[in-house]
Amino acid sequence: GTVVCAGGGIGIAAILPILTALKQAGNKVISVLAGRSKELVIMVDDVRQYSDEVIIMTDDGSYGEKGVVTVGVEKVIQREHVDKVLAIGPPIMMKFTSLLAKKYGIPNDVSLNTIMVDGTGMCGACRLTIGGKTKFVCIDGPEFDGDLVDWDEMFKRMGTFKEIEAKDMAVPNPADKKGSDHSSSSINNVGDEASVDREKSSSIDKNNVSTDEANESEEVWRKALRKELKPKERTAIPRVQMPELDPAYRATTRLEEVNIGLTPEMAMQEAKRCLDCPKPTCVEGCPVGIHIPDFIKHIEHGDFLQAASILKETSALPAVCGRVCPQEKQCESRCIHLKMNSPAVAIGYLERFAADYERESGQMTLPKVAPSTGIKVAVVGSGPSGLSFAGDMVKRGYEVYVFEALHEIGGVLKYGIPEFRLPNRIVDVEIENLRRMGVHFQTDTIVGKTISIDELKEMGFKGIFVGSGAGLPNFMGIEGENSINILSSNEYLTRVNLMDAANPETDTPLIIG
C-alpha cells in the first residue's frame, strides 16, 4: 500500500528504520520531513534512499516548501489514495498529523515520548489513557494508534514540571557538576570482565565450623546450654520488644530507621527462649532453610560473629530479611512456642541483630565459594529474588551476571520500601558482599528491549533466571485515575524512595496539596 511517513526534528532519525522496512516490504513510501528551518531537517539523503518521494517543509521556507508538516501530508492525501500515516516528531506535530489522518478516515500511528524516568512503568511519568485504558509508553509503546491517544491528557502530563524546570534552568545546579557514580560496564563487555580473584573474595571467615573437633566442641556447649534452663523457664521469658525511635522525633525525619535494633543483652535474653528443638519446624517455615536454632544458640552463647556466618551459609540477604521478611507468616508461624500459647521466638529480630553486629564490628566475612564451573548464568532483575538466586549460584561456582532495568541495584528493596523501614545503606552492604563473592551487576539494562534472551544465549549464558518482580500496578478504570498527580502506590514509592522526590530540590519532586 501507500504509506505517508511524517518526521519532524529528531523524529526523522526514529522514523528512518521504519520507512526503510516499509519500503523493503514492497510499500510505496512518501516521506514528509519538517523543521523550523533548514538546519533542523536532518538525514534527508538517508530518507531519500528508501522513499519513493520526499517532501520538505520548513516554517521559514529556507528549505523545500514553506509551511508545517500537515500541509505537506494533506497535499499527498488530496492527490492520491493513502493507506496509512505514520508520524514521529514533536508531540504537537504528531497530534495534528493524527487528527488530519482521522479527518480523512486514514489509519495512523504515532510514536509517543516516553518522558522516561526509569523505563519500567514504575515511575508513572509516561502513564497515559489510550483507547480508554491505562498504558505506559515505555512498556506498551512507544507506537500507538493516534486515534486512541488522549492528547489533552498527554500534554498536561508533559507539562507537570514545566514551571519548576524553568526556574531550575535559570539557576545553575551545583549537583550537575558532580560525576556519576555509575560504574557498570557495557553489555558488550559482559563476557570479557576480569574474573574475580576467588581465593581473595572467598577468604573464608575464621569462625566457620568445619572440623570434627570444632563440631564436637559445639555439641558440648550446646548440651550444656540446654541444661542451663528448663523448657518451662525458657517459655516463661517474655518476648523481647524492639526498641523504636521516639514518636515525636520520628515525625521530623523519614530517613532514619524506626526500629533501632536489639542490644547484645536483649538478643542473648531472647535467644534463651529458643528450645533448640531436635526437629525444628521453624526451619521448615523458612523459604531459604536457614539453620535457625544453630544461629540462635550461637547468639545465646555470645558468639555473634559465628551466628552471622551461619546465616550467610543459606541467605544472601540476612540484614535485609531480618528487617522485612514476613517472619510471622514463615519461620515464626511454625515456632513450637505457639503450640504452648506463648509468643514465637523473635527470629527476625535475632537475624537482624547478628547481621548488624557483624557489619558494625568491621569483621565482615564471606561464605564459602566453590571453585569456578566456568558456566555463565544470567539473572534478570536485582530485587530480593534475583539477589538471593545470584548468591546461591555464585556460592556453587557459577559465573553470575545480574541485569537491572533501573539505575540502581536492589529492585523493590530500593524503590518500594521506605528508608525508615529498610535503609539503603543496609541494602548496599548486602549487594557489595555479593559483588565481592564474584557476582557481576549491569544497570540500565531492560532484558527484552536493551538486550534479548537470544542475545544472552549467544553471549554464552547457559541459564537465565527471571526475577523481574511484580511490575506494573493494577488500575480500576475509574474517571480521573490518570489525572496529573494521581499516583499509584508503586509510582509514589518509586519517586520518593529511588528518586528522593520528597526533597523539593530534586529534578522530579512530588508536589501534593
Task: Give the label of every model feature segment.
Residues 1-117:
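FNR/FR-type flavoprotein reductase catalytic core
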Residues 2-4, 9, 13, 357-396:
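Extended interfacial segments that mediate partner engagement and assembly in macromolecular machines
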Residues 5, 87, 466, 488, ...:
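Redox-cofactor binding/interface segments in oxidoreductases and associated redox assembly factors
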Residues 9-12, 91-92, 122, 316, ...:
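Residue-level detector of alpha-helix initiation sites
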Residues 15, 21, 272, 279, ...:
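Rossmann-like dinucleotide/flavin-binding elements
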Residues 107-125, 492-501:
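Short, flexible loop segments at boundaries between secondary-structure elements
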Residues 142, 150-200, 205-373, 424, ...:
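Ferredoxin-type iron-sulfur electron-transfer modules and their immediate structural context
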Residues 308-318, 350, 412-461:
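N-terminal Rossmann-like dinucleotide/flavin-binding domain of flavoprotein oxidoreductases
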